[in-house]
Regions:
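Short, aromatic- and glycine-rich surface loops/edge beta-strands on solvent-exposed regions
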Residues: 73-81
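Conserved "repeat-terminator" motif of extracellular CCP/Sushi domains
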Residues: 1-16, 125-128
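Aromatic-rich carbohydrate-binding modules that target alpha-glucans
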Residues: 28-69, 81-94
Length: 128
């Protein structure tokens, strides 16, 4: 590009809308230095991705944030080995749903926190 060029270039920055979800594991899932991750899936175009969850001190639960335009609409919550830190199925100790053949649908009713049942085999969405 020449300094004397009559062509002008502009950049437009668009802020992506995000949504934060929360996860409340039971006491059993918190043992042995486990960490938590979520496997997110877009059922419309069959894309998926791993997200690590971080602990939210103020709410006493774990969280992850998705970009709304990515269209992820279902998840698998995973209890991961403390080490290695890589999110992949080989490092997943337990998951919900436990059937290995399904997902938990992300809520569309304003609820934003998945609370794991005491037996670790399911849970329900609540508002945090």
């Amino acid at each position: 590009m020449s300094v004397n060029s009559s062509v002008h270039y502009y950049a437009k920055f668009v802020k992506s809308e995000t949504k934060t979800y929360y996860f409340m594991p039971n006491d059993t899932w918190k043992k042995d230095g486990a960490r938590f991750a979520v496997y997110v899936h877009n059922s419309s175009n069959d894309t998926s991705e791993w997200y690590s969850m971080t602990y939210d001190e103020a709410l006493s639960c774990y969280s992850f944030t998705l970009t709304v335009s990515d269209g992820y609409n279902e998840v698998i919550f995973c209890r991961m080995k403390g080490s290695p830190k890589e999110n992949k199925w080989e490092n997943c100790l337990q998951q919900v749903p436990a059937s290995y053949s399904g997902y938990v649908s992300l809520p569309t009713d304003g609820k934003n926190c998945y609370e794991l049942n005491s037996d670790g085999n399911g849970g329900s969405w609540i508002t945090k």
